């Protein structure tokens, strides 16, 4: 299905649309809108290769989308947006769309997938700045509540995402919300071979 409500009028952010990174079509089932002003933002890492160029990032994202749709049976790539090592923001499900990223919170949050494994290091400054600017844009357009709290997936699910080192960094941020009351534990989905 076509993705609507796309707004890339965020000052200073280098957006890469689904068309630009070569996305497959979303499956139409259960592709619902989230509410305006979601109260939670989740940072994830893709737990795989990093990328430093648009072509390399696009290639990695296409592989993740195929895994999420074909191996895991999801409607689309899990994340609302992905952030590459080049500092660009890649459109996943986009604004105001339910993701498949954080059990129990998919319909009341947005997710940013940082491309790479951040268990032993923090994403680079360009990536962190892009995420900060994306949140501010989301607030300005009404997609994210001005009173949002920021979390890693491990604050809501039994996962190590977004990696130990990145998570320690997140805990120092002003809007960090910590472990959430509704905490969901399930077996992790099957691995993606990216």
What residue ranges belong to the model's regions?
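Basic/polar, cationic surfaces and motifs that engage anionic cell-wall
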Residues: 1-46, 84-194
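Active-site acidic/histidine clusters and adjacent loop/turn architecture
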Residues: 35-69
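Glycine-/small-residue-enriched capping loops at alpha/beta junctions
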Residues: 68-75, 85
């Amino acid at each position: 299905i076509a993705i609507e409500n796309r707004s890339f009028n965020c000052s200073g952010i280098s957006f890469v649309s689904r068309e630009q990174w070569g996305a497959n079509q979303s499956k139409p089932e259960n592709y619902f809108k989230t509410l305006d002003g979601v109260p939670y933002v989740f940072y994830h890492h893709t737990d795989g290769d990093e990328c430093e160029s648009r072509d390399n990032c696009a290639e990695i994202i296409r592989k993740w989308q195929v895994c999420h749709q074909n191996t895991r049976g999801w409607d689309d790539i899990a994340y609302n947006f992905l952030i590459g090592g080049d500092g660009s923001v890649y459109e996943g499900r986009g604004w105001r769309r339910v993701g498949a990223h954080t059990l129990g919170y998919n319909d009341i949050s947005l997710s940013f997938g940082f491309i790479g494994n951040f268990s032993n290091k923090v994403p680079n400054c360009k990536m962190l700045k892009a995420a900060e600017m994306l949140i501010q844009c989301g607030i300005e357009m009404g997609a994210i509540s001005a009173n949002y709290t920021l979390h890693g997936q491990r604050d809501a699910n039994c996962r190590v995402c977004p990696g130990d080192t990145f998570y320690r960094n997140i805990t120092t941020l002003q809007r960090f919300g910590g472990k959430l009351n509704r905490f969901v534990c399930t077996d992790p989905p099957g691995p993606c071979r990216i």
